[in-house]
């Protein structure tokens, strides 16, 4: 990648309904008033906003060249009128930061080239409503942000369109709600209607995904998943992950796995249980394998399976409002050098037929 010149960042130019900060018009970006397209030309970082955020525009943002793009969408309000995507990445990799409140109706679409990639940065903040993230060829990485992605007709909220697979989707963080909707059935995250294949990896964040259905029955519509789809490989390593299927589909459909050191909290029915003995995480309120809490956790019900272990490290608390059932081992563990204590704060009932152990005098079970 060539060195990025940031000398012009901060300048503001109006192009159509947008304000662009950074770069120079007709050098780093250009505007076609007839086509209503803002095309990004170089790697220089750009900040794009609506001049009037309360008023939506029909102008699309497009990236055609095989290079790395760096753009920030800040209070963008656009509606795609071409049905090809409000933000279109034809070639290259787009690194996008989301700020403020963004509405992208028509979605973020990766089209026509296997080289097209999308990365949403962990610096993203505010709230973004996107009508679908995906396309024909997809390499999608979401590192942060507060994003709601709603699929169009036959399309997943994040992933494929009609007869398309999921592509390669990685979620590392953020708060994400994905809904498959539009005319016909589609998965929340995964394949579009009648699509097959792809991979979904979830390493962190709070993810909620809903399979959608809004009508049509000839031919009969397929079952849809919250996350996955036909022959989709799902690897859940961390975060809080909820799936909600539709039309008789599982909440998680496809080939389901966890990492050997996974600590995700997963909620939803899982179609594929062939690897269940190797699952590691809190899955449907049951601790499986060896799980180290990565954040304060609040439960109404939790069971630690036989031969499973739940470790609560220094600075973390487990708050029980309902029933905690332990058949395995719970370790309350204070790390040297971390001043805050770890504990189980019990506001309900603990049923223990296993071991609850503290690694030193600070580890505690506190009943409130």
Regions found by a protein language model. Give the residues of each.
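A composition-driven surface/loop motif
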Residues: 1-368
């Amino acid at each position: 990648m060539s060195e990025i010149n940031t000398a012009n960042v901060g300048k503001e130019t109006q192009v159509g309904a947008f304000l662009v900060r950074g770069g120079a018009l007709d050098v780093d970006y250009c505007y076609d008033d007839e086509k209503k397209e803002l095309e990004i030309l170089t790697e220089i970082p750009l900040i794009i906003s609506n001049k009037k955020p309360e008023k939506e525009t029909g102008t699309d943002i497009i990236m055609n060249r095989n290079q790395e793009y760096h753009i920030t969408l800040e209070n963008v309000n656009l509606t795609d009128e071409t049905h090809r995507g409000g933000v279109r990445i034809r070639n290259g990799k787009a690194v996008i930061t989301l700020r403020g409140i963004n509405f992208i109706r028509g979605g973020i679409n990766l089209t026509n080239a296997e080289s097209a990639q999308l990365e949403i940065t962990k610096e993203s903040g505010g709230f973004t409503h996107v009508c679908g993230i995906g396309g024909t060829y997809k390499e999608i990485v979401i590192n942060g942000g507060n994003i709601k992605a709603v699929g169009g007709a036959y399309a997943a909220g994040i992933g494929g369109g009609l007869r398309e697979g999921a592509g390669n989707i990685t979620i590392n963080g953020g708060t994400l709600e994905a809904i498959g909707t539009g005319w016909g059935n589609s998965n929340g995250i995964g394949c579009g209607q009648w699509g097959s294949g792809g991979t979904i990896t979830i390493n962190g964040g709070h993810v909620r995904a809903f399979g959608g259905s809004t009508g049509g029955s000839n031919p009969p519509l397929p079952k849809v998943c919250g996350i996955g789809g036909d022959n989709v490989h799902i690897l859940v390593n961390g975060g809080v992950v909820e799936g909600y299927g539709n039309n008789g589909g599982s909440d998680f459909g496809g080939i389901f796995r966890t990492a050997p050191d996974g600590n995700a909290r997963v909620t939803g029915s899982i179609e594929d249980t062939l690897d269940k003995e190797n699952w590691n995480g809190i899955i449907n309120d049951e601790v499986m394998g060896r799980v180290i809490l990565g954040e304060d956790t609040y439960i109404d019900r939790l069971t630690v399976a036989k031969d499973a272990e739940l470790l609560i490290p220094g600075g973390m608390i487990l708050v029980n409002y309902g029933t905690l059932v332990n058949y395995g081992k719970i370790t309350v563990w204070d790390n040297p050098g971390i001043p805050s204590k770890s504990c189980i704060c019990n506001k309900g009932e603990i049923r223990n037929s296993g071991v609850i152990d503290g690694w030193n005098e600070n580890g505690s079970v506190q009943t409130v």
